[in-house]
Amino acid sequence: MIIQAKVINVSQTVTGKSATTGKDWANKGILLGWEDEDGEQFIRAQVAENIWHEYALQVSDVGCIALRFRTIQSRKSNYVYNDIRIVPLPNRQ
């Protein structure tokens, strides 16, 4: 899904190591906002630091952003949650 949104806030980078793959990761939390027929809308998404760098957007910038949604169930707690990620924009030729 691609949306046109304003960057409201960008969190500090959080780092860790994947328990599944053993790979290091570095993510940021991004708060995005836009207006539609129902008024102001907001969504918080995670993004890998290197992907966010490719977008080159700063707080208050408006741009096209690609989002991926998936539902995940925790193996430990059986808790179900939605994972919203900012992903690279598809190549448009």
Please place each PLM-identified region on the residue numbering.
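Single-stranded nucleic acid-binding surfaces, predominantly the OB-fold ssDNA-binding core
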Residues: 1-93
